[in-house]
Amino acid sequence: WADLNTNNLDDPGAFYGVTSVYESNENMTITCSTKVCSFGKQVVEKVETEYARNEGGRFVYRIQRSPMCEYMVNFIHKLKHLPEKYMMNSVLENFTILQVVSNRDTQETLLCAAFVFEVSNSEHGAQHHIYRLVKT
């Protein structure tokens, strides 16, 4: 999630990036594909490869401070400058991010997450909900 109430977004030298941490019982190389979709169509995709680090018997994968693409930076700027929250939500209704983490060597999908956004009216800042989809 993101906090649009911060003033740092207007700083010309602001850094826009994402940090992700994954963990596994197995040593492997992973690829993380992040697709930005607008109105159901893919706009941009970023694919990153990460190698395991053994940390106390667990294999940890850290993608740290991965820079956002220019499309995302511009999107955030335009969204932040809309005058009303309902306008922001109208834009966000047609915006999603799909992230797929796979074993690079076997192509097995390890994790698939879809991010759907809305502007929170909460006094407590950004909120999130996590749902797990399973086969029955």
Curated annotation (Swiss-Prot):
InterPro entries documented for this protein: TEC1_TEAD_TF (IPR050937), YBD (IPR041086)
Any GO MF annotation of the entry: zinc ion binding
Keyword flag Zinc: yes
UniProt-listed Gene3D superfamilies: 2.70.50.80
GO biological process: embryonic organ development; hippo signaling
Pfam families: YBD
Compartment annotation: Nucleus
GO CC annotations on file: nucleus; transcription regulator complex
Keywords of this entry: Activator, Developmental protein, DNA-binding, Metal-binding, Nucleus, Transcription, Transcription regulation, Zinc, Zinc-finger
Job of this protein: Probable transcription factor that function in the regulation of cell-specific gene expression during drosophila development, particularly in the differentiation of the nervous system.
Protein name: Protein scalloped
Organism (species): Junonia coenia (Peacock butterfly)
